[in-house]
Amino acid sequence: MSYEKAFEALKEGDFKAASALLEKAAEETGFESDLINHAYTLALYRAGEKDQLAQAAFRIGESLVDTDPGSAMDYFQRAFLGSPDGLNAAKMSRIAEIFALWTAPKDTSEQIAHPVRKVAHIVGSLAASHPTAAYVRMLALSLKQHGIESVVFTTEWSSSWFVNPAGESETQNLDPGCEVVIASVDGDFNERAQRIAASIRAYGRDVAFYHAGLREQITTRVATFRPAPIQVYAGRPGETAAAPFDVLAGALPASDIEERMQANPPSTRQGMGLESAASVSATFGNLQKVGGSGYLHALGEILQRFPKHFHLFAGSGDVKAIRAYLHAEGVLPRVRFLGAMSDVASVMGVVDIYLASFPHPGDTALLDAVGAGKPVVALRYPPGTPYNANAEMVGVPELLASREAEYSEIAMRLIRDREAREKAAAAVLARFQKEFHPSSLGPRYLRLVEEVRENH
């Protein structure tokens, strides 16, 4: 049977038509044609059919697990380009199960070094746009202060693949403060992972830190080969297979905001059109999660109470709902939308207090505010729940509210009372220096590694 019309539509850029025709072709061939499977998932991606892409790519990947692991990972990686609804928890669990089956048994006879002297960091790339690059640099420099040598091994998972067929590395000329080994992009995902694992073994590592989970298939596949005596997962919590790791630490919170504020020329209130502001608050992060929340009600109340108070928003997301609400409250003229910013360090100097949005936490931006010594007002939720992440990070009782009205009261007190604001800033900064300063990152991970060694 000929599928020329389907491929012609794809070639001509009619992705909607191509995806419909290629779906039929894939069904008719039982999802066994490499050419059609690739074209079908490409058409879905180009057409923006994210749910369907996640489902189709997962189905294809699962069918290849036993016969072609490299291609299976390729399609699982495509599935992650789909929406969270398409790749649901059940599918995530299934992928984790597959990686567990691929995981090599732990060599209990292998000697674990004490003290640790050499560690490997496995990361997708060291691109400037990749937040993990800054995190790896913080950890490597912290470990170096304790006499521990680091080497970064990139996987370059997004190069020479699917929508990015170019064979060039995405890693840029960034200095993580240690040696960097950039992965070759030759071969399939399985072959690429095997080479990286062999390089880590040859390096003579004591510990390997993996800075990504299942969303970077090659990175997790490297872990399944167990190239290090102790393996630490240091990526986003809940996004990996547990089997290959001795420590599921996740990315322990830390911020290099102090260094970034020194490196970025500071904005001024005059330069931002805030000359008339008596005080300024801010909220940074994914603004899509702000609209319609009780947080907006609290912000509107604060702005109404203090006619010379201004507020800054920075981040991605549709702000129509935010603007509409604040316009209805009559306070929109004193709100500035800065859009998506690669780094908020330059505007931290104009901020007096940081208002953490709720219920959705904004860990990275909030931690930057804490590190900049800004009093952060946050809402408490039951301990251990995801929504309580903001409160747990702030950790200063006087800044934590148990209800929306109290949230507003705390913010208003800080706006009104400079002395209270300075006292809160000192408390927040002291907590940051003790718990989240980059220099503390290495020792925090090493304590977890030591627990593994003692139980070996």
What are these regions (language model features)?
Residues 76-172, 176-178:
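N-terminal subdomain of nucleotide-sugar transferases
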Residues 77, 81-90, 226-266:
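Active-site-proximal region of nucleotide-activated glycan assembly enzymes
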Residues 132-142, 256-328, 334-337:
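Conserved catalytic-core segment of nucleotide-activated headgroup transferases in glycan assembly
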Residues 195-198, 203, 340-352, 371:
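Short acidic alpha-helix that forms the nucleotide-activated donor recognition element
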Residues 200-215:
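Short N-terminal targeting/anchoring amphipathic segment
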Residues 332-341, 358:
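Active-site donor-binding acidic/aromatic loop of nucleotide-activated sugar
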Residues 353, 357-422, 426-432:
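Catalytic binding pocket for nucleotide-activated donors in carbohydrate/polymer assembly enzymes
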Residues 438-456:
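C-terminal alpha-helical cap of glycosyltransferases
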